């Protein structure tokens, strides 16, 4: 039962990764490294669908890297379809932000550290710091 629920959450995370990657591509060409990050996000989402657990960390990092590209267009951009696409992309990024604790565990495992509570907490704090920087970077 618990394993089925976890598989269901990973499916939603992979689906949101594919959707946010697809939606970010029309917005991304005028921004910094947007297409590259969207491509990495799409590949990681497909890897997660194939059962690769490390892809959770890559999806979360890629979605955090898409934030500086997308949120200014959603909040500060001109109206019309580009703004709606940016808002839909931000909505699709939400499951990745909510998966940060699982990404912290996956990152701790990828680096070869023991998955102690302290290491996972520090990794989670680092992911949160990256998220804050990603939100503030366009304002600098």
Positions of PLM-derived features:
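Topology signature of small-to-medium multi-pass alpha-helical membrane proteins
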Residues: 1-140
């Amino acid at each position: 039962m618990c394993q089925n629920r976890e598989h269901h959450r990973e499916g939603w995370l992979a689906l949101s990764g594919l959707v946010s990657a697809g939606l970010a591509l029309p917005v991304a060409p005028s921004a910094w490294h947007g297409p590259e990050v969207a491509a990495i996000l799409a590949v990681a989402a497909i890897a997660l669908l194939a059962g690769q657990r490390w892809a959770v960390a890559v999806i979360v990092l890629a979605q955090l890297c898409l934030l500086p590209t997308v949120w200014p267009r959603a909040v500060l951009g001109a109206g019309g379809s580009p703004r709606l696409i940016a808002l839909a992309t931000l909505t699709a990024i939400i499951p990745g932000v909510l998966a940060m604790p699982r990404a912290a565990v996956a990152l701790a495992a990828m680096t070869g550290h023991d998955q102690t509570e302290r290491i996972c907490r520090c990794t989670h704090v680092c992911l949160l710091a990256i998220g804050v920087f990603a939100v503030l970077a366009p304002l600098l």
